[in-house]
Every structure is written in structure tokens, then in C-alpha cells.
Amino acid sequence: MLTEGREHRQSFLVGSKVSASRCHAIGVQALLAMVTILWLARTAPAAVQAPVLAAIEDSKGAEIFSGLCAACHENVTSRAPSPILLGIMAPNGIVRALTEGVMRGQGQALSAEDKIHVAQFLTKRRIDDGTDRLAPPACSPSDREFAYERVPVFSGWGITPGNTHHVPDAIAGLTKDNVSKLHLKWAVGFSGTIRIRSQPAVGGGSIFVGTQDGILYSLNLETGCARWQFPADSEIRTGIVISPWSKGDRSAKPLLYFADETNVYALDAASGKEVWRRKPNDHPRTLLTAAPVLYKDTLFIGLSSAEEMGSSLQYECCTFRGGVIAYAARSGKELWRSFTVDPPKIQGKNAVGTNKWAPSGAAVWSAPAIDVDRKQLYIGTGDNYSRPSTATSDSIIAMDLKDGKIKWVYQATKDDVWNTGCLWGQRELCPEPEGPDFDFGAAPVLARADSGADIVVGAQKSGYVYGINPDTGQLIWKTKVGRGGTTGGIEFALASAHNSVFVGVVDFDDGKQSPEPLRPGLYSLDLLTGKYNWKRPDSWETCRGRRLCIPGIYAALTVTSQMVIAGNTDGWLRIHDAATGELLWHYDMTEPVTTVGGGEASGGAMGGPTAAVPLDGKLIVPTGYGMAQYAPGNVVLVFDTK
């Protein structure tokens, strides 16, 4: 893609294309110092800048970080946020991550005081500075009222039950004729955080969105003021789902469904009051990343985990099992649960005498797709963490809606057993032989051609896209789109409309040798054959002069009948012609904007399972992905054509 008017400035790591292995040869500390100098020399987004306070030094925190944390967070091939990105966070956000969030497994080795020291060392701020979050301004009484006449029009995160992410033109209100009229209407920023992974829901005149610091906001759709806010226990990274009601029915009690890292919640959509919460799995490394899926009176949630993220020889690896749990949506009563692997058994001992367990893994990273006609759901699974491997890892699986029984399995990659011990070179923790880590991160799509034919589409980190028969699980076609890899291929970007499949590829260089070139970009395939309709590859040129910039598409896509809407990892929001791939409109999400609270903020890359949401001529965009080497940000942008 083009540089799109940006001035020409070389970006270290990006412009020079330093390989991961070369980065290690340079030395991680020296590399981070160079990145820090170059990064801070440029204007950082105001939304993610820490308040100007007297910096503090915490030597005890430095010692703890060096001993327990640096190996991952100072590894340039890791997805773990670098110390630079962690330094932007609010100190209480780091403490929460170590206590209740994704790092709670590592945090078990730390006392409450130790966690505070680590947070203060990284942020150079005291835990009690009182500057952790700047909430959007509260609505006036007239703007706070829930609008029962404005019913939700999307079924959930996947927009349709089949996860097509297809918004009809009449609902989107956005076409090739008016897309050039898009202009920023308002923006909300959330200080002290560095990413937004929660795809918003819209209903009742509100935008509902979750934040990294665990707050669910109800924002007035027209003004951006906060109607209410709800504190969850940890980061909200899932999409938000709202139950339907009849237009104008003020007796209705619509509920919101979402998950933080370990709990599923149901809230009253009008007031934000908690109706129920459930902890779906007692495994200590459980991590909820898939948006809940609401179908009729049942709520489905996939189970993923952080168990593959590395541990020690003293940890009994591995025992987590991926799966799906079904709840009665109004009460939270569990209806059934179905696992992707059998219960683990002891498989011997490791070098220090710790029990080894298997099978494990086959996590469900993204939302299930619902097949109304066949009364089944489809999930994608990840790799196994320990040997022996199973026939359900790296698979698309069909389950019966009524009881979760597995109806068929299509396994795309056999014998993929992997954990981050392989990434760090910890051979005693890495399964032998080492698998390629080719998860299905993108949610499966049940796509319907204009002829009426149904195909289940799966997209994998291997770079392959698959067309599968929904009745039998038999492969119809497969197409290699990206090079793939541990951090590459297709992560979340998969959508379909009419006879086309749209795929976003990130293809980040993970340091592994490959004869294939990286192929980040946007691609369109024929739904029935898998053949290319068009290709829109990205270029490294788009990153010249941009800090923490990597070309490609990591986040989920949204499509209309005419257009493909893609938030890119280089910080640009782009809208393409669905028929040709031609660029119709673009916006630099890293540019500073004035928020409804009066402050200055900006976004960054887009990543994870979030996507832009078009509705009634508006476009709602959560932006910022402070992970690994992606640009941080924490802003919701709302554009309008009117």
C-alpha cells in the first residue's frame, strides 16, 4: 500500500527489516534502548501518554522484573508487551493483570507488595497517583435515558449467526456513493491503557464497549457521554452482545453479555446492573477470548487459556482443555459443556521429576458460528500443549446445539504440539517434535452463496483458508493466502458476503526460516472454489516514518455488499471496493483527536477480535493494539456521513 501522504522517515525494526534472530544478536537491552530513543523522539499519541508527574524509581520492582518477567517482555519475537508499552499503562492496570488478569499465573509467585513494586518500576508512577483513568463525561439526565425504540440490528459479534461479519447496505447506511463523506463526529479516550480488543455493540441509543482496565461503558451514540459504567474483574477483550426486544417495549429487560478474562457476565442493558456472572472453568490458566454467542434463549462461550504461554519445570504441564459451555441466557444456568480433548492423564515425569500431563489444549479462541438450519455450531481450535497430540487440535469442529456432542471434525494440521517454551528456546519445556503453532484464531464462518449453497470457511495461522462441507466436514477446497507462522497468517480477519470470502493476512516475521515471502494484506476468494477474485498486498512502504508499524491486517473485518472495512496494523483504517479491492477511503488512526472530555487522544493499530461497526451512516471504530510491536492506542472513534 501507499505511504498515503506521510513524510518519509525511517523506522527502526520496520524500515531496516531487522530479523528476529538478528535482534537477539544485537542484544535485547541495546535494541530496546534504541527503540525507546527513536520512539520517544516522535510525538506519541496523547491518549496513551502518562500524565506529567514526578518520575519515581523502584529498585525492588526492577529486580523482580529482571528475574521473573524480562525473558518474555524483552524478547522481540514475543507477543508480550515490551517494557516501553507497559510503561504507558496505569500502574493499577499492571497490578490487576498480575492478580486477576492474563498474568495471574506468573503473579502467583509475587506478594501483593511485589506486584505494586513491579507496576511502579515499569510506569515510573506510584500506585496511588490517582491518574489511572480519565472516564468519558457523565451524561445529562436527558442523554442518559435508554431508547427502547432503537432496537439492536446485529445478532452479536459475528453480525450474523454464521459470523459472516456482513452488514447489509440498508443497515450500514454506508455505500460507495457516500463513503467519501465520512468525517469524525466524536471520540472517547481511556487514559492509562494501551489497547482496545472489545468489539462494540449498539442498541437502545448506546454504544457498549469494554476496556483494558476492565470497565464496560454505555456511551450515548450521538454524543459519547457515559450513561453508566460497570467494573469487571479484569480486561474485557471480548465483543459485547445485546439481547433483542420489540421496538418501543419499555417493559423489556434487554441484557448485555460479555466476558473478562475469567468470568462471563450478564448486565441490565438500561442500567448496567449485574444480573448474573459465572466462572465457566476452574482451571487457573483459563482465559476467555471468544465473544459470547446468543442464539434464542441460549448463550454459548468458548474456552481458551494462557497455559501454553510458558511456565517452569516445576509446573505440571499441561492440563487445560478447550471447549464450549452453554448457559440459559436469562438465568445463567449451565445447560451443557463439551470439551475438545479427553481428560488429561499423567504421561511420565520431566527432568526434575514433575508430572507431565496430556492431552491438553485445543483451545477455542473465537466465537462459535451458529447453523440455524442444521442445528449445530462450529468452532475453531488451537494446538495441543503437550504430547500425545489429539485429532481435534487445529480443527474446525461441528457440535450439536442441544447437547454439545461433536458431529464431525476437520483437522487441518495434524500433530501440532507447541508451547512458548519452544519460542524461548527452553527445550526441556518444548514438546518434541515441536509443532508449528497453527491455531485457528479466526472464528469459523458459515457462508451462503447466492445460489443457496452453504460452506463453512475456516482461516488458519498457517496462511491457509479452507472451504468445508457443513453436513459432512469434508474438505471442498483450500487456498494458501499467507506465509503463516507463529505470529502470522490469518489471525482474526475473515468475513464473507454473497459469493466472496475476504481474508486479512498479518504475516509478521517470527524469525523462522521460510522459502516463502511474507504476504500481509487483504485478499478476496471465490466462496465456491477458493480461487482468487483479487489481491491487495501490503507494502513495507506504508510503514516508513511510522513508529511501531507493521503492515498487515490482524483484526476482524467488516463487509457490506459493496465494501470491505479493515483496521490495519500499520494504524490506518481502510475501506476497499468489495468487487475490486480498490481503496475507496482511508483514515490515519494514530492522528491526535479532541475527545468529548476535552482532552487530546489518538488510536493506533487494530488487532484482536475487534472490528469497525457501520450503522445508519455511522462508523464506530475501537483502535489501539499495544501488544508486541504494534502501535498502542485506546480510543473509540465515531464517524458519520451526515
Predicted regions and their residues:
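Blade/loop signatures of beta-propeller domains
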Residues: 138-184, 340, 345
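A short helix->beta-strand "capping" segment at the edge of beta-propeller domains
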Residues: 171-192, 350-352, 539
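Beta-propeller blade signature
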Residues: 320-332, 392-405, 519-529, 634-642
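Electrostatic cytochrome c docking/interface patches
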Residues: 46-64, 135, 142-143
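Repeat-blade elements of multi-bladed beta-propeller folds
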Residues: 151-159, 193-215, 234-264, 287-316, ...
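Short loop/turn segments that connect beta-strands within beta-propeller blades
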Residues: 220-223, 268-271, 328-331, 401-403, ...
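Surface-exposed loop and turn segments in beta-propeller and other repeat-based domains
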Residues: 279-282, 337-358, 407-435, 480-485, ...
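Extracytoplasmic electron-transfer domains, predominantly the class I c-type cytochrome c fold
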Residues: 50, 71, 79-127, 376
